[in-house]
Swiss-Prot record:
GO molecular function, one term: mannan endo-1,4-beta-mannosidase activity
Keywords tagged on the record: Carbohydrate metabolism, Glycosidase, Hydrolase, Polysaccharide degradation, Secreted, Signal
Every GH26 domain range: 41-353
Cell location: Secreted
One GO term describing the cellular component: extracellular region
Membrane-spanning residues: none
Enzyme class: hydrolase
GO biological process, one term: substituted mannan metabolic process
Stored InterPro entries: Galactose-bd-like_sf, GH26_dom, Glyco_hydro_26, Glycoside_hydrolase_SF, Mann_GBD_bact
Binding site for substrate: 132, 200, 270, 429-430
The protein's name: Mannan endo-1,4-beta-mannosidase A and B
Length: 513
């Protein structure tokens, strides 16, 4: 129920309100055995960390957000998420679909979003990829909503057939993109052929809630063919395979390719009542794999008024084996509905900067302010500072504080340094402001560094941040020259013209990764 799906909202759905039984995962699942024994160590570490999240008391469900489709920027959705919630999602998603019609069906596959995924990964996040695959029953165009007849579906695994050749060419195009990510050290939560129990994609059912075993077998064969080709021929050892049917249709496990071909089981859910999915959840976790909500959002009729806090409450109360969720974009997105702050700031939720799977590039703390200002200074202050303060902190009990006068002004907190940061890819600083004063349309801030003998200015994107809430600002250091000679690190704050009075700005927990 996305990609602008015009599927009618169906309420002919049986609600299950039974008490959730206690279901535990086997030792194999807890031991996080990937389907691919040759998976690289980073991928094994990510999977093991995800699989064991339900054993924690807090910070146990990774947040995610769909960023968009290839050949379109994903930056705006990251900006919206951070401005509204003060957090960056732990997982960023892209779909390898190209919306522009191409002359050959395989060219509808595009991995133009890879660089943004690489950047997000280097900044401490995880990535997931879906593919709204074009229809191999056609030579050109996408036709992804046109059902492929079962007889043609069965031809896919015979690469000598017309459909099989097109299928193989599409696999090659996807594999090229996934291989580029592998070469950049990126592990991918790979989610192909999703919502197969629905009737809206070519690989799905032929009618509403229809099930045909022959067609299901064709689906399973196609999945396994893709898996074998990617894993054994293309040597893609960076993939975690995600199987995700839709909650609105039956037969959620009837298309399951098998434990040797799947690593995570998930549900795509655009249901008005997230608490009523117990039956589907129980069926999925009975497959003995880590569980996720691979897509969440409101039904079409509730887009714009849906309360996303219902999802995190439902996860906590009814679906405790959930290891991640992924909110969709556009009118289904948290920032176009209600409850975004509650969703991303719950104590159970893991956001970017909090992911710790034993990666080789953990965050290194440059500055905290538990004892003193550490020689940080500021400018454009008319009301004093900086000092240390316990009024707000991102880590520990103290932060750096300065009092400022609002009204179309800018301010800087900075540290003059002589540092070599050439071995790092990302710099992050957490900020906030006090609750007093009228900030008008909202304050913004960005991280900056000055490098080289000319003190060259380099800055991240401006981001709006809220009072008494933590917002993580960052700058991509891979785009900064002379990192061996960093002269200054700091944050530039701006108050809008329609602000007035006085407030305090804060800064804390300066880290590099």
């Amino acid at each position: 129920m996305k990609v602008y799906k015009k599927v009618a909202f169906v309420m002919a759905f049986i609600m299950f309100f039974s008490v959730l039984p206690t279901i535990s995962m086997s030792s194999e699942a807890n031991g996080a055995a990937l389907s691919n024994p040759n998976a690289n160590q980073t991928t094994k570490n990510v999977y093991s960390w995800l699989a064991n999240l339900p054993n924690k008391s807090n910070k146990r469900v990774v947040s995610g957000h769909f960023g968009g489709y290839s050949d379109s920027t994903l930056a705006w959705i990251k900006q919206c998420a951070r401005e509204l919630t003060g957090k960056m999602p732990g997982i960023l998603s892209c779909d390898y679909k190209n919306w522009q019609t191409r002359l050959y069906v395989a060219d509808q596959i595009s991995y133009g979003c890879n660089q943004e995924l690489i950047n997000f990964w280097n900044q401490g996040g995880l990535v997931t990829i879906s593919v709204h695959m074009p229809n191999p029953g056609f030579h050109s165009g996408e036709n992804y909503k046109t059902i492929l007849p079962t007889s043609q579906f069965q031809n896919l695994t015979n690469h000598r057939t017309t459909e099989g050749r097109r299928w193989k060419d599409m696999l090659d195009k996807m594999a090229d993109g996934l291989d580029e990510l592998q070469n950049n050290g990126v592990t991918v939560l790979f989610r192909p052929l999703h919502e197969m129990n629905g009737e809206w994609f070519w690989w799905g059912a032929e009618g509403y809630n229809q099930f045909d075993q022959t067609r299901a077998n064709a689906y399973i064969s196609a999945w396994r063919d893709m898996y074998q080709y990617f894993t054994h021929e293309r040597k893609l050892n960076n993939l975690i395979w995600v199987y995700s049917p839709d909650v609105y249709r039956d037969h959620v496990t009837s298309y399951y390719p098998g434990a040797n071909y799947v690593d995570i089981v998930a549900l795509d859910s655009y249901h008005p009542d997230p608490h009523s999915l117990t039956d589907q959840y129980n069926r999925m976790i009975a497959l003995d794999k880590p569980f996720a909500f691979a897509e969440i959002g409101p039904p079409e009729s509730m887009a714009g008024s849906f309360d996303y806090s219902n999802y995190i409450q439902a996860i906590k109360q009814k679906y405790p084996r959930t290891v991640y969720f992924l909110a969709w974009n556009d009118k289904w997105s948290p920032h176009n509905n209600r409850g975004a702050w509650d969703l991303f700031n719950d104590s159970w939720v893991v956001n970017r900067g909090e992911i710790d799977y034993g990666q080789s590039n953990p965050a290194t703390v440059l500055y905290d302010f538990e004892n003193n200002t550490l020689s940080w200074s500021g400018c454009e202050f008319t009301d004093g500072g900086p000092w240390t303060s316990n009024e707000w902190s991102a880590n520990g009990t103290q932060s750096l504080k300065a009092d400022v006068v609002l009204g179309n002004n800018s301010y800087h907190l900075q540290k003059t340094v002589n540092r070599n940061l050439s071995s790092f890819k990302n710099l992050e600083i957490k900020v906030s402001h006090s609750s007093w004063g009228n900030v008008g349309s909202g304050m913004t801030a960005r991280v900056f560094v000055k490098t080289g003998s000319a003190w060259r200015w380099n800055a991240g994107e401006f981001c709006q941040f809220a009072g008494k809430r933590t917002t993580a600002l960052s700058i991509d250091l891979t785009k900064v020259s002379n990192l061996h000679d960093v002269r200054e690190i700091g944050v530039e704050y701006k108050a809008p013209a329609n602000s007035n009075g006085k407030t305090a700005i804060y800064l804390d927990h300066v880290t590099v990764r």
